[in-house]
Regions:
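Metal-dependent phosphoester-hydrolase catalytic domains
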Residues: 17-26, 33-135
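Soluble non-cytosolic domains of exported or imported proteins
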Residues: 1-9, 71-72, 120
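A long, amphipathic alpha-helix that forms part
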Residues: 3-23
Length: 135
């Protein structure tokens, strides 16, 4: 379990890093920030001075990259961010949660957790993809 404060501090560090230079930048990965915490603390909204956040720019029909069975809810625990106004941007139509028969559990639409015996599935999250252009 990772407290939301650790997430907020990580995003603050990203803001400090991007503010320290003027080069294009890309930040991506598993930020483990739930939609509930994002709404409560405006974490992604607070990044908008420096970053475009993929799931806020495109993928409007995407539910998320992770499904919480207990709460029956989807979250974007994973995302991709590109620096704002620095010659790098998303091709918004390319932003997507990557689902295939291989990484989706039966007909549920949920991630097929990786099975080390069969070598099938993904992690507990779906991959998140986007085409990025540099001008």
């Amino acid at each position: 379990f990772h407290p939301v404060q650790m997430r907020i501090e990580s995003f603050q560090k990203l803001k400090e890093l991007i503010a320290s230079h003027s080069e294009p930048a890309v930040a991506l990965g598993d930020f483990n920030l739930t939609n509930k915490d994002d709404k409560k603390f405006n974490v992604y909204k607070n990044q908008e001075d420096y970053w475009y956040v993929a799931h806020r720019e495109g993928c409007s029909s995407c539910l998320g990259t992770y499904y919480y069975s207990r709460g029956k809810s989807w979250d974007f625990l994973d995302t991709i961010m590109v620096s704002r106004n620095r010659g790098v941007e998303f091709v918004n139509s390319s932003i997507d949660v990557y689902k295939t028969k291989f990484n989706t559990y039966k007909n549920t639409g949920k991630p097929n957790w990786f099975n080390s015996d069969t070598k099938q599935g993904v992690s507990d999250h779906f991959p998140f993809v986007a085409e990025i252009t540099f001008n």
